[in-house]
């Protein structure tokens, strides 16, 4: 059953239960179903072709969810977007846009302005409404994922893939409410939102870190979902504001980027002891997961391979290698579909290098695009980053390879400092470390690292930034 059908189910079974909580609005399941029904009726009057997907740029999270669900109920595939993605819509075959802020329009196709007339009138008895029986058909969700490149790539998540995902993850009876920190334009935020609503529980969203932590205390939220960088941002705020109560948090689920031991220790000491790492992708969903308690002593460990996932480590020729030996990671899951585009011989290649242990733990040592070859010496950027981030005066680090005028690759490192830092002294300390062995060519102190929606450092943008800094010195 589709998540939209389940919303209508819960609207009948438990109509007054909050479905979506934000700082200025509580939307019950009955209210959400009413909104979906009314918006779906309006969409039917627009004369759109159901074979063409529709993008949405809606600021209010409850309305964004309601409009996306209404489109699916009316038979349309949906592309949740933001202002920065509008220019990428038409080149990717998406000509129709529903938006709520003037100026958020795309060239060509239909630009449809949403307003409150699409919503049902206030009613004192919303549960008495007789909803049309209209099961959701075979519709897709369309995402644009940038990963570490910063360049948006279109990905299509099929109805079948979403159904398989929900059947596997929406049965957690212990979770009552979840603060979804990740945005509603990416698979992580959308999938977790659908999981929570599918199971009749409550999704919580807020626009700022302070408002998020205030919601946790006010509504006794038990679960938090986000990228490591998003959760670290909330950790930093809690360290500054110890008066904000977060005692109700029982679990934090993080996915999308890597995080060092020091960051994990801060999160567990400040927000919640139970932190679960998820190794996942927009294209093929979850492949491995584990509480950090179980993997914290294993270098590069990202989780135990999930029972539904098939993970292989292969060499450059595609031949499987033994456990313990590094190679190219590939995997497939029931949600994975060749329709997604990032496919070779029915496997998904996330672009990571790593190995499997005999206990079924997946360990990641770097990216295939992040192997820096310095005169024949191969260095994993991730190893350098983890090494530098152990230094007390460094909050974040990112390494990349940049070719000099002769075409020889050099190791460049950018750091975000903890307070003030002596760049030359830090560079000397890094150079002297056995893991670097004098290979560092340039060190840059920057206020922040360029990151995508899930917190991954975007290495293409990083290189452009650092090359620009060299050009100005």
Model-predicted regions and their roles:
Residues 298, 312-331, 358-359, 419-423, ...:
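Conserved beta-loop-beta connector loops within the AMP-binding
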Residues 8, 16-47, 55-61:
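Conserved AMP-binding/adenylate-forming core of the ANL superfamily
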Residues 163-177, 185-223, 237:
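Conserved AMP-binding/adenylation subdomain of ANL enzymes
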Residues 224, 351-438, 448, 455, ...:
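AMP-binding/adenylate-forming catalytic core of the ANL superfamily
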Residues 1, 116-139, 152, 166:
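Flexible, low-complexity linker/hinge segments
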Residues 222-223, 239-297:
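Gly/Ser/Thr-rich phosphate-binding loop
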Residues 28-30, 132, 140-167:
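Conserved AMP-binding A3 loop
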Residues 304-308, 319-348, 361, 377-379:
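Conserved ATP/PPi-binding loop(s) of AMP-dependent carboxylate-activating enzymes
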């Amino acid at each position: 059953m589709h998540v939209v059908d389940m919303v209508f189910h819960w609207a009948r079974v438990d109509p007054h239960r909050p479905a979506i909580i934000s700082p200025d609005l509580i939307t019950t399941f009955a209210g959400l179903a009413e909104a979906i029904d009314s918006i779906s009726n309006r969409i039917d009057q627009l004369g759109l072709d159901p074979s063409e997907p529709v993008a949405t740029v809606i600021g209010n999270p409850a309305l964004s969810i309601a409009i996306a669900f209404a489109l699916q109920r009316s038979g349309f595939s949906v592309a949740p977007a933001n202002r920065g993605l509008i220019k990428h819509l038409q080149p990717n075959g998406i000509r129709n846009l529903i938006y709520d802020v003037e100026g958020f329009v795309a060239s060509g196709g239909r630009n449809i302005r949403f307003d409150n007339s699409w919503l049902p009138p206030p009613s004192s008895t919303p549960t008495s409404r007789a909803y049309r029986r209209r099961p959701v058909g075979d519709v897709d969700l369309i995402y644009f994922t940038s990963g570490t490149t910063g360049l948006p790539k279109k990905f299509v998540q099929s109805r079948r893939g979403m159904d398989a995902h929900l059947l596997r993850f929406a049965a957690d009876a212990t979770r009552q409410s979840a603060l979804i920190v990740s945005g509603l334009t990416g698979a992580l935020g959308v999938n977790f939102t659908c999981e929570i609503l599918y199971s009749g529980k409550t999704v919580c969203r807020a626009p700022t870190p302070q408002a998020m932590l205030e919601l946790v205390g006010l509504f006794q939220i038990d679960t938090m979902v986000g990228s490591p960088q998003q959760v670290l941002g909330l950790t930093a705020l809690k360290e500054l504001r110890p008066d904000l109560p977060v005692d109700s948090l029982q679990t934090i689920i993080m996915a999308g980027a890597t995080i060092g031991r020091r960051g994990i220790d801060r999160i567990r000491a400040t927000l919640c002891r139970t932190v679960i790492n998820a190794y996942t992708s927009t294209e093929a969903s979850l492949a491995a997961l584990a509480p950090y308690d179980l993997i914290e002593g294993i270098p590069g460990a990202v989780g135990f391979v999930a029972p539904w996932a098939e993970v292989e480590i292969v060499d450059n020729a595609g031949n499987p290698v033994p456990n313990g030996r590094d190679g190219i990671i590939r995997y497939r899951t029931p949600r994975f579909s060749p329709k997604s585009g990032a496919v070779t011989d029915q496997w998904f290649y996330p672009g990571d290098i790593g190995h499997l242990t005999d206990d079924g733990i997946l360990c990641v040592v770097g990216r295939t695009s992040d192997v820096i070859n310095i005169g024949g010496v191969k260095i994993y950027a991730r190893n350098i980053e983890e090494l530098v981030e152990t230094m007390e005066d460094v909050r974040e680090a990112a390494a990349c390879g940049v070719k000099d005028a002769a075409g020889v690759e050099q190791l460049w490192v950018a750091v975000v400092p903890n307070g003030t830092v002596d760049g030359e002294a830090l560079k000397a300390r890094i150079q002297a470390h056995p893991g670097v062995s004098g290979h560092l060519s340039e060190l840059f102190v920057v206020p922040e690292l360029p990151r995508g929606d899930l917190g991954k450092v975007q290495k293409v943008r990083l290189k452009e930034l650092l090359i620009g800094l060299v050009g100005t010195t």
